[in-house]
Amino acid sequence: MAATGSGRSQFISSSGGNRSFSNSPLIENSDSNQIIVSEKKSWKNFFAYLGPGFLVSIAYIDPGNFETDLQAGAHYKYELLWIILVASCAALVIQSLAANLGVVTGKHLAEQCRAEYSKVPNFMLWVVAEIAVVACDIPEVIGTAFALNMLFSIPVWIGVLLTGLSTLILLALQKYGVRKLEFLIAFLVFTIAICFFVELHYSKPDPGEVLHGLFVPQLKGNGATGLAISLLGAMVMPHNLFLHSALVLSRKIPRSASGIKEACRFYLIESGLALMVAFLINVSVISVSGAVCNAPNLSPEDRANCEDLDLNKASFLLRNVVGKWSSKLFAIALLASGQSSTITGTYAGQYVMQGFLDLRLEPWLRNLLTRCLAIIPSLIVALIGGSAGAGKLIIIASMILSFELPFALVPLLKFTSCKTKMGSHVNPMAITALTWVIGGLIMGINIYYLVSSFIKLLIHSHMKLILVVFCGILGFAGIALYLAAIAYLVFRKNRVATSLLISRDSQNVETLPRQDIVNMQLPCRVSTSDVD
């Protein structure tokens, strides 16, 4: 048991466990930038919780989402809108669980994984999480390269190389206030959202068809399932679960049972508002693309653009709103989207590395490593396949994220449904059942598509029989390993109880926010013995 400097709050563990969390100080001296939640019960407290949900929602309107939305509308009109609705609802439930985990336990998801799993599973989960961060960064790289191409006519492959420099410059500007920087970027992103809302008025999509697409599930035509999975992967991202569970630790909240419950409730409302905005943006992008590309009076040039629509060609969709400036405005918003998503991705990567390995890097170095890994495949594809190939790589990256989601989602569901970790704030049975149904559907769709696509690939391949058999053995062995890894996470019992920060002597005791989360730099944290 270790006490803070004031002696008011204590870490109480119901079970020792064979692994411990890295120690995190409770800061006694708050600075002027801290967000402090009042002890008094009031709806005004909600404003103190605004922030994490909107930062997380940036990932829902990143270049990867724009790319998949544009292709979904161009190829299937409004038929895949229901995927956006389902994914947004699922994202709200899942993101709220991530926030609850951080609020209740004081530790984010990656730290919980390190405490719960042994070295080998923990290392593998870290590898998968890092791959997810890199896969998430690929659309940002390509989206930024497309934006530079539209703004300055820079070849896409050169733009790919320049993306590392542009993001490092933005990260260097953090010393002037990261909040101001992120709000500026978010403003630019929502500028393009307003344009799509206005374009929605000009394109006049049929309301009945839009509602039918939103509420009637259908997957017709070749490639619809793959695009649906990429839409799902672009909406519910594994790195967001790590990010959200960490960002909520930046608030100073009352540690009473009622204070924690209020924090969870307000974070749910905040996440709902943020994801509602992201949902409307994604629906408008699909609807505009569907209405414009399926119009009967489409010009031959626009029809050609729609047949192979990607971020580099999408500016013509805004022509009715801003005319000849459509390309420049879309490029600026695309650049803002890519850079803002990269910054939040950098934070997520920091928390992943710190949580799983207890290893911390400077933000610029962390971003450089991630960006280099994302640039390599992007550069190769841009050189070989041009902008069309780069656009297809965004879809592939989104599909990779969808396949990797179970390795972040299952631990989250297990932890938040565990009484020894969440105490009285454990998920109700109804929420537990709902979240497992959501997780099961996501995993089921992924597995079905993976197996069916692999079989189709083998059947239609022109390889010799011996090579088909060899590839089949390797492929199905990989699928079996994938299923076994998910099964291990699902059926393994939680063995480590969380150390909860609680109060023995007061219902109004507060804990100041985690210092490493507040300043977003992940400095070396002093042990609790140093705080005494």
From Swiss-Prot:
Feature: compositional bias, Polar residues: 1-12
Protein induction: By Mn and Fe deficiency in roots.
Keyword tags: Cell membrane, Ion transport, Iron, Iron transport, Membrane, Transmembrane, Transmembrane helix, Transport
Main localization of the protein described in the UniProt heading: membrane
Recorded coiled-coil stretches: none
Mutant phenotype after disruption: No visible phenotype under normal growth condition, but under Mn limitation, very slow growth and unable to take up Mn.
Annotated segments matching region Disordered: 1-25
Spans traversing the lipid bilayer: 46-66, 79-99, 123-143, 151-171, 181-201, 229-249, 266-286, 329-349, 372-392, 393-413, 431-451, 466-486
Membrane topology summary: Multi-pass membrane protein
Pfam families recorded: Nramp (PF01566)
GO molecular function: cadmium ion transmembrane transporter activity; iron ion transmembrane transporter activity; manganese ion transmembrane transporter activity
Family: Belongs to the NRAMP (TC 2.A.55) family.
Function: High affinity manganese (Mn) transporter involved in Mn acquisition from the soil. Required for Mn uptake into the root in conditions of low Mn availability. Can transport iron (Fe), cadmium (Cd) and cobalt (Co).
NCBIfam families: nramp, Nramp_1, PRK00701.1
Name of the protein described by the UniProt record: Metal transporter Nramp1
